[in-house]
Regions:
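Divalent metal-cofactor coordination and adjacent catalytic microenvironments
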Residues: 1-202
Length: 202
């Protein structure tokens, strides 16, 4: 029996399986914004750009560049809302059937709505989800989220925020830990980031 709400009714786990192939801004773009004209810190600047992207993605619940995720659920909800936006595509939905075997749900069973934010995966007309075994992580949704494979597809406002946050990290050099930095982010940058937060999370 499907449940109505993914977050409130069941636990879920999200894992990044394929990282973005590019960062939102290049090393050259970052150095131009920072007014750095030497190459001694290129690797360090690249690390700061990645950290800025990761923080922005965490707060906004977005993926700036196409990234592949797996979403694990204990059962099928009535509607699946992948917890990263914008939803680009659904690669597959697999499930553990009542005999304990892993099966792939036919794509004809569900519709993928990439226009709504967050995106939605819902049953097609006159279809139903397959029966699953009662166990943890019985349903696995593999999907791609992001504005595209190229940085040029990212909205200009978000690219500018990446530059601003990278500049803040560069000016206040603190250890980079899991995409975050210890120094408090200025209010104007934080406000710009929160403006892009997906309001309705799954």
């Amino acid at each position: 029996m499907p449940v109505n709400n993914l977050t409130n009714e069941m636990p879920w786990n999200l894992t990044e399986t394929v990282a973005p192939s590019v960062e939102p801004i290049t090393t050259v773009e970052a150095k131009l914004h920072l007014r750095v004209d030497h190459g001694d810190e290129d690797a360090y600047i690249d690390t700061l750009v990645a950290a800025a992207r990761q923080y922005i993605e965490l707060v906004t619940r977005r993926s700036l560049v196409n990234t592949t995720f797996t979403l694990k659920l204990d059962a099928y909800p009535t509607e699946i809302r992948p917890p990263r936006s914008p939803l680009s595509s659904v690669t597959s939905i697999t499930y553990v059937d009542t005999d304990g075997n892993t099966q792939t749900e036919a794509s004809s069973v569900y519709n993928v709505d990439t226009d709504t934010e967050p995106g939605r995966i819902s049953l097609a007309f006159n279809q139903s989800w397959s029966d699953t075994r009662e166990q943890n992580n019985a349903v696995v949704v593999t999907f791609v989220a992001g504005y595209g494979a190229a940085a040029s597809n990212i909205p200009a406002a978000l690219r500018e925020v990446v530059k601003m946050l990278t500049a803040h990290y560069y000016e206040f050099r603190q250890p980079v830990i899991s995409g975050t930095i210890a120094t408090k982010i200025p209010m104007h940058i934080e406000s710009l980031i929160w403006m892009h937060r997906v309001l309705e999370a799954p």
